[in-house]
Amino acid sequence: MSYRELIAELAREHAEEFSDALLELGALSVSVEDADADTPDEQPLFGEPGLTPDRTAWQRSRVIALLAPEHEPAVLLTAAANEIGLPAAPSFTVREVEDQDWVRLTQSQFDPIKIGERIWVVPSWHDAPDPEALVLELDPGLAFGTGSHPTTRLCMEWLEQSVQPEQSVLDYGCGSGILAILAKKCGANPVYGIDIDPQAVESARHNSERNRAEVIYGLPDECPTGEFDIVVANILSNPLKLMASMLTSKVKPGGKIALSGILARQADEVAQVYSRWIDISVWREHEGWVCLSGTRRESH
């Protein structure tokens, strides 16, 4: 008998408690999504660097629970509703999840990705399509960034066009390390990667070793005090605005900065914050996301 997914929609105030109750009652896993994702009502949620977000669910939240074959969805749903004091169980749907070779299936979903003119991001179970290209060996993992997301792609294309040999580069919010590794392969030196998540830092170090790219990684309090020829930050618009003074202070006068993780509708607001120090504009847009790029004005 196959596994099943139980899918229910709940209001924001109940989603987290309901998810916890499902796990306590035996659900194998539970995820919460924005029920309005990919619509005009989509609500991005994020926390400031180092802080827990003040909301952990959406106005209309979709709770998805994976159930073992022996679990009856309606019974589990009713029990979870009773557990958190809901007057009635929410409506739900169920879909079958066929058991299969999950490792092979996962690998089949990640093919080599070509980015820009000569960049290939290649999972370890694939051969590089073009050995003469800039090849980054990277497996999907816990840290964000394999080149498939528009913001990562935009930053990679920008780095390919912008990095000159022996320029210093800071990747702030490095995630998997993909941008720092690419900068190194483009000839940058030295290259630093900073992230607030220790797990991301460890993942980035592992990826750099695999790619034989010498990058220095650390947490924010380990960020170098000097200035860099290039600073790149692929985070989110609100943290980027909050960190504008700090990030621009890391750019040498005449140096360049690239910012992404910004929706097209947020571009003007972010650019306005950085315009105090940087001559900045939209460099490129892709699938509703933008990369802002600019040059730090010379000191007078």
UniProtKB/Swiss-Prot annotation:
CDD domains the UniProt entry points to? AdoMet_MTases
InterPro entries for the chain: Ribosomal_L11_MeTrfase_PrmA, Ribosomal_PrmA_MeTrfase, SAM-dependent_MTases_sf
Keyword list (alphabetical) reads: Cytoplasm, Methyltransferase, S-adenosyl-L-methionine, Transferase
List, alphabetically, the SUPFAM superfamilies matched.
S-adenosyl-L-methionine-dependent methyltransferases
Q: Name one GO biological process term.
A: methylation
What EC designation does it have?
2.1.1.-
Q: Which family does it belong to?
A: Belongs to the methyltransferase superfamily. PrmA family.
Record's protein name: Ribosomal protein L11 methyltransferase
- Gene name of the record: prmA
